[in-house]
Amino acid sequence: MHRLLVHAEALEREVADLPRDAARHLKVLRPKLGEEIELFDGCGRTRRYRWNAARGVLDAPLPLVCATVRPFPLTLFACVTKGSRWDWTIEKAVELGVARIVPVISDRCIVRLAPGERTAKAERWRRIAEDAARQSDAVWLPEVLEAVDFPVALDLVKTCGRVFAGALTHPPPPPLLAAVSRELPAVRSLGLFVGPEGDFTPAELAALLERAVPTSFGPTILRAETAAVFGLSVLAAACARS
């Protein structure tokens, strides 16, 4: 079934009032007469409408559906990677149910964003998140922040109950699953902090581990986007069991 993201008030109406992007997407879809289209507001509510070809509108809605439980609040702090690899990270994070994505610029990030570029980039990343939510049947849309420098990200770590960081330290830290299992169900929100391809600088790692729990992601070195998906999968599975 095709899905469109709309403003919350659109779901209250008998004839759907679509925002410009959703209306454009609907036109591309070319729905058939009577075809059901699901609208969602990104805040846990969905409603199905039928395409009225004669009037060119979505009407005859079914009852409004509200998600009864919000997913466990997960935050991904991830150093920005190049091009499509970062887009893929956002997409998979949405599919795995994160509540917030914090793009981070650390000393060894290949991607460098001037302050004036960050707003436009964040808008693009939010569109990627919206597309991922629409395609994955997600009903909650995560908050996607503008890219922040590493010191700012450290301050944001304080907003999570507990944050876990992949750390290449000696001796190796405990596996991520074991570390998470020790914290649940006591904490109310979790975060994952993933470094850049070149890893954190020693100073960054020391500062991060004053605020985050060091963990191991396994015996091999993972690429940044792989580490993000692996870590979020572990956290999501652990939260689902707790």
Where are these regions (language model features)?
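Glycine/charged-rich beta-loop-alpha catalytic/anionic-binding loops adjacent to active sites
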Residues: V15-D17, P71-T75, R188-L190, L208-F217
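Short connector loops at helix/strand junctions that flank enzyme active sites
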Residues: K32, T46, V69-P73, L96, ...
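Structured adenosyl-cofactor binding patch, chiefly the S-adenosyl-L-methionine
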Residues: P202-S242
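N-terminal positively charged helical leader segments and presequences
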Residues: M1-C66
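RNA substrate-binding interface of SAM-dependent RNA methyltransferases
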Residues: A67-A165
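Active-site/ligand-binding-proximal alpha/beta "capping" segment
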Residues: V163-L205, V213-F217
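Gly/Ser/Thr-rich beta-alpha loop segments that engage phosphate groups in nucleotides
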Residues: E36, R85, E197-T201, T220, ...
